[in-house]
């Protein structure tokens, strides 16, 4: 028997309110990455992000925009998230002048055809745990 997953991605996105986003960096990037995963943000994840960053970048599941604050001024950044609070927080933090697109989009829906081939790098940190179903 094939069991179909009922998708409700809103449940995973709605936890990211302006209040929880204020605590996000401390908890996720500080405590969780270092202590739970043994992968400190500044020592491992940020250098990995910057090493693979292109000039025209798409960030999917933007969180607070922490990683985007470290991109060169010449970079063009597009943001994709289902949560408007996250999109706004990341755009503000990264700097609106760097933001090419803010895309409110459910990752379970087809990727917008108008965006095909526009990016030379894509990142997707911390998204899988927000998706419905079992991993």
Language-model-derived ranges and their functions:
Residues 2-53, 66:
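Conserved class I S-adenosyl-L-methionine
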Residues 54, 119-120:
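Local beta-strand N-terminus motif with an aromatic residue
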Residues 58-111:
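Class I SAM-dependent methyltransferase SAM/SAH-binding core
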Residues 111-117:
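Short amphipathic alpha-helix with an adjacent loop that forms part of the alpha/beta core around
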Residues 123:
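A conserved beta-strand element that flanks and buttresses the S-adenosyl-L-methionine
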Residues 127:
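Hydrophobic adenine-recognition pocket in adenosine-nucleotide-binding enzymes
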Residues 131-135:
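A short, conserved alpha-helix within the catalytic core of class I
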């Amino acid at each position: 028997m094939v069991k179909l997953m009922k998708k409700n991605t809103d449940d995973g996105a709605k936890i990211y309110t302006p209040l929880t986003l204020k605590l996000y960096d401390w908890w996720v990037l500080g405590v969780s990455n270092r202590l739970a995963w043994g992968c400190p943000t500044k020592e491992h994840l940020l250098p990995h992000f910057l090493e693979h960053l292109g000039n025209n970048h798409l960030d999917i599941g933007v969180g607070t925009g922490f990683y985007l604050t470290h991109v060169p001024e010449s970079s063009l950044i597009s943001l994709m998230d289902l949560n408007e609070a996250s999109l706004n927080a990341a755009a503000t933090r990264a700097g609106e002048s760097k933001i090419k697109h803010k895309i409110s989009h459910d990752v379970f829906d087809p990727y917008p055809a108008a965006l095909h081939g526009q990016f030379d790098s894509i990142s997707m940190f911390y998204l899988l745990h927000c998706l419905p179903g079992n991993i």
